[in-house]
Each structure stands twice: as C-alpha cells, then as structure tokens.
Amino acid sequence: MSIYVIGDLHLPFGVNKPMDVFGEDVPNSENIKNANGEYIIPGSSIRGVLHAQMKKIEKYINKSGLVDKAFGYGGERAAEGKKGNLICNDTVIDCEKQMDVIRNRIHIDKFTGGVIHGHKFREKNVAGKVRFEFEIQDDGNADKTAALLLFALRDMAMGIINVGNGYATGKGFISNSTIIIESMGKVGMISKADIIYKDNENIEVSDNENVLAKVM
C-alpha cells in the first residue's frame, strides 16, 4: 500500500545545519540539503513527528502494539528486535518559485523567560511544495498501520502538528494538502482514494472503491 501527501510548506521548515562559511551577510545555519544540492526534509524527521502523534492516537483509542508494528522496535540482542512495516524516505522541498528567506532569531533563557545577551543568530529557511511518500509493507498489519498513519496525517493536514523543530515560531506546517491512498488488489488492480484539505478546514473525499472503509 502507498500513501502520498502533497501540500504547501507555507511557513519555513525547521531542520537546520551549521554553515561552513562565515560573514555578516551569511546565516549561522540553513536547511539540510541532499547530495544534489536540493533542500530536503529528512525521513527521520517525518518518522519522528508521525511516531509521536501515532503514539498519542494509539493511547487515545486504548490500543497497544500498533506503533511498534509500524515503526519496529529494538532489543538487547539483534534477534529480539523487529523492523516495522512503514517506510518513509527523504522529501525534496520544491522551493524554486517559493520562499528562501533569512530570519533573525534570539535565544530565550528557558528558566527566566528572558533574552540571553549576545545570542542573536540568523538562520536560512525555505518553503515550497512537498510530496511525502509512504510505503506500507503487506505483513498482515498493513491496514492497521495505514489507519493509524491516516489519522496522524489528518492532524498534519489540519495544522495540528508540524514537521521539524520550530513549532512555537510557526515553522514546518503544511497547508492545502491532498492525501492519496493507493491499495493493490488481489488481481493486480490498484484502488485509489483522495482526501483533499482546502485551507486546512474544508475537506473533500473521493473514494469510489471504498479504500478507506477497508483500512479504517
């Protein structure tokens, strides 16, 4: 089963790395890039936020073990661990015609709530079109993983959770999202359903083949 999320990263994303060059007009950090020089959202960042949200949903519906089956778990010995059935790769940010901005930031003392003197910094953030791609392996738990993932992606599409750091400063939120679910049938036919979020509030569902009913 494949699930895709297409949307606008309408506020700057927040996974940064230190710059290798210095200067007054050079930011202290910028978004992570891949070997091709493209800005990316690491798969580990996507997995991290989804793992946390799916864990909350699992607790809310009073179930256990669903997240472990999706993401896997470790053990003291290699034989005791188990890999999950949810695969998530890095996502390229298509920011060719979108925002590429340097922001001035300040450090806040978490104990006093005041500004730390001399800790002003500059970071380069980007925004643009994104397409998250998820593959769920058919191991007997694919439908349960898909259902839990769709609930978490719904929260992302509605602006309840963000990707990366910077939640408090409005970074990493997705808008105008379309969630696409593709399921392979027994005879090799692909069934498809679309969930469209307009302005993070108005929702349209296209599911003529009852794909959602099979996994929810």
Model-derived features: positions:
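Small/polar/charged residue-enriched interaction surfaces, especially the RNA/DNA-contacting tracks
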Residues: M1-M216
